[in-house]
Design a protein with these regions (language model features):
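Membrane-interface helix-capping segments at transmembrane helix termini in multi-pass transporters
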Residues: 5-13, 45-55, 66-103, 148-158, ...
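Membrane-interface junctions at transmembrane-helix termini in multi-pass inner-membrane proteins
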Residues: 106-134, 154
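Interfacial/gating helices of multi-pass transporter permease domains
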Residues: 1-21, 153-158, 191-203, 216, ...
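Transmembrane-helix boundary and interhelical linker motifs in polytopic inner-membrane proteins
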Residues: 6, 23-63, 82-85, 115, ...
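Membrane-interface helix-loop junctions in multi-pass transport and translocation proteins
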Residues: 2-9, 126, 137-169, 231
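Alpha-helical transmembrane segments of multi-pass membrane proteins
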Residues: 74-77, 87-112, 129, 141, ...
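Small-residue-rich midsections of specific transmembrane alpha-helices
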Residues: 14-42, 61-68, 104-112, 167-170, ...
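Interhelical loop/hinge segments that connect adjacent transmembrane helices in multipass membrane
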Residues: 160, 171-215, 229
Length: 250
């Protein structure tokens, strides 16, 4: 991929990826909360309460999706000021296009993410992992032909976004077709909401720390040095991530 893109183009892709990774913080730990509270309600067997839970979580994610658009717009308009020393004019133009695409991706992904969490709560782990495997494999399989045809980092972001939303739409289809989930949009139980937010806060805190620790450095390199340095650093980070995964397996 680096050979086909070149250091500068790959560095731009890695830089925008690290910047937009902060969008994942907006999940607020709700994904884990959905699994926990849906699983707990399944033990009770009250479908009406489950429908209310689904409705409440979907409303929260819709709000987060709208918030994502506003944050993406702010990043877009301030991109020139942030990376004026590190990126060229053509790189800034591509970066803005990539920010728009990824912002749209996340704006749709947050509301759709509820269905993947519901699948986990219903212990349909095989189908959930199968979708994840297909999504992971589909990205390089689709991307490589486009790279050989001369497309660059913008095309990669488009492919990643389309594959991601496609996998989330499959989760939506599976939930309605096979799990038969329902949604009820009534008055929100504020006591339950407070309990859920209290639970998800610590997950949210962990995500923030993780993002600051692993993604801030690429952002700083891009702002002060340039995309080539980001590319070299991103390659080194790949080896660190491989080592981390090996540790978790052991």
């Amino acid at each position: 991929m680096i050979r086909l893109l070149g250091q500068s183009e790959y560095g731009l892709y890695a830089l925008i990826g690290s910047l937009i990774a902060y969008f994942s913080v907006l999940d607020l730990g709700l994904g884990n909360a959905i699994v926990r509270y849906t699983s707990r309600n399944r033990a009770v067997g009250d479908k009406q309460i489950e429908a209310k839970l689904n409705g409440m979580f979907l409303i929260l994610y819709l709000i987060i999706g709208i918030l994502t658009i506003f944050i993406g717009a702010i990043i877009y308009f301030y991109l020139d000021d942030i990376f004026t020393n590190g990126l060229s004019t053509s790189e800034l133009r591509k970066a803005k296009i990539m920010v728009i695409i990824i912002t749209i991706n996340f704006a749709f992904s947050f509301p759709l993410a509820i269905f993947g969490s519901i699948i986990q709560a219903y212990e349909r782990f095989v189908i959930f992992k199968l979708v994840e495997i297909v999504r992971i494999l589909a990205v390089p399989i689709i991307t490589l032909p486009f790279l050989y045809l001369g497309f660059g980092s913008v095309a990669m972001v488009v492919i990643v976004s389309v594959v991601n939303i496609g996998s989330l739409l499959f989760n939506l289809y599976y939930c309605f077709k096979y799990i038969k989930i329902k949604f009820h949009f009534g008055k929100i139980d504020l006591t339950l909401l407070k309990e859920i937010l209290g639970y998800s806060f610590f997950v949210f805190l962990g995500v923030i720390v993780d993002q600051i620790y692993w993604n801030t450095d690429q952002f700083i390199l891009g702002a002060l040095v340039g995309t080539v340095s980001v590319a070299i650093y991103a390659i080194a980070m790949q080896f660190i991530n491989m080592y981390k995964r090996k540790q978790y397996e052991e």
